[in-house]
C-alpha cells in the first residue's frame, strides 16, 4: 500500500482570546480559537535570551467546539491535535484570499485542557485545595478534561502527584 502522506498538527499553547462559537444551519457548532506557541533560546553571540511567539488559527467542530466555548478562556493552556488546512474565499472587493488553519474535526481531532481551571473555581480534577505545607492524598483521576472526536480512544493518564509548592502564576509567562 503506497503512503499518501501524513497531515497531523500537534500544538500546546495559550489562547489569545476567548473562543468564538457559531452554529451552522445544520446545527453543528464551529469554534474559532487563536493559539499562541512560544519558544525561547539563548543567542550564541550575545548570550541574550530570545523568544519568538507564533500565532495559530484553530477551527474546531461539533462537540469539541461546544466544549471549547464553554470551558476555554483567554490565557487557557490547551493541547490540540488536528490537520493543517488552507481555504480560499473571495473578499468584498472580489479579491481571492487564502488562510491556513489547524482544523480539529469532531472525528479524529483532540483537544485537552491543561493547567487548572481559570477564574477561581475548584482545581481541575475536583481536588480540594489545601494549604501548601499540608500533605495531600493522591486523588484518583477524574478525567473530564480530555475530549476527542471519538475516532480513537486514548488511555487515561494518571494525574501527577500534588506537590507542596504554591501554584504557578502563568499570567507572567503569557506573551499577551
Curated annotation (Swiss-Prot):
A motif (Important for interaction with partner proteins) lies at residues 171-176. Residues 134-150 have a biased composition (Low complexity). InterPro entries: NA-bd_OB-fold (IPR012340), Primosome_PriB/ssb (IPR000424), ssDNA-bd (IPR011344). Residues 6-111 form the SSB domain. One of its GO terms (biological process) is DNA recombination. The keyword DNA damage applies. Gene3D superfamilies: Nucleic acid-binding proteins. GO terms for molecular function: enzyme activator activity; single-stranded DNA binding. Residues 116-133 have a biased composition (Gly residues). Keywords: DNA damage, DNA recombination, DNA repair, DNA replication, DNA-binding. Residues 111-176 are annotated as: Disordered. Residues 151-161 have a biased composition (Polar residues). One of its GO terms (cellular component) is nucleoid. CDD domains: SSB_OBF. Homotetramer. HAMAP family: SSB. Plays an important role in DNA replication, recombination and repair. Binds to ssDNA and to an array of partner proteins to recruit them to their sites of action during DNA metabolism. This is Single-stranded DNA-binding protein 1. It comes from Salmonella typhimurium (strain LT2 / SGSC1412 / ATCC 700720). The gene is ssb.
Amino acid at each position: 500500500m503506497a503512503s499518501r502522506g501524513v497531515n497531523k498538527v500537534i500544538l500546546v499553547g495559550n489562547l489569545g482570546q476567548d473562543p468564538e462559537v457559531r452554529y451552522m444551519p445544520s446545527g453543528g457548532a464551529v469554534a474559532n480559537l487563536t493559539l499562541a506557541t512560544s519558544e525561547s533560546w539563548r543567542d550564541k553571540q550575545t548570550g541574550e535570551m530570545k523568544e519568538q511567539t507564533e500565532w495559530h488559527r484553530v477551527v474546531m467542530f461539533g462537540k469539541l467546539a461546544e466544549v471549547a466555548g464553554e470551558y476555554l478562556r483567554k490565557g487557557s493552556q490547551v493541547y490540540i491535535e488536528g490537520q493543517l488546512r488552507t481555504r480560499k474565499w473571495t473578499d468584498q472587493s472580489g479579491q481571492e484570499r487564502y488562510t491556513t488553519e489547524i482544523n480539529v474535526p469532531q472525528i479524529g481531532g483532540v483537544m485537552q485542557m491543561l493547567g487548572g481551571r481559570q477564574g477561581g473555581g475548584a482545581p481541575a480534577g475536583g481536588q480540594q485545595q489545601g494549604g501548601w505545607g499540608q500533605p495531600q492524598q493522591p486523588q484518583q483521576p477524574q478525567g473530564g478534561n480530555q475530549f476527542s472526536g471519538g475516532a480513537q480512544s486514548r488511555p487515561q493518564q494518571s494525574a501527577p502527584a500534588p506537590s507542596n509548592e504554591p501554584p504557578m502564576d502563568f499570567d507572567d509567562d503569557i506573551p499577551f
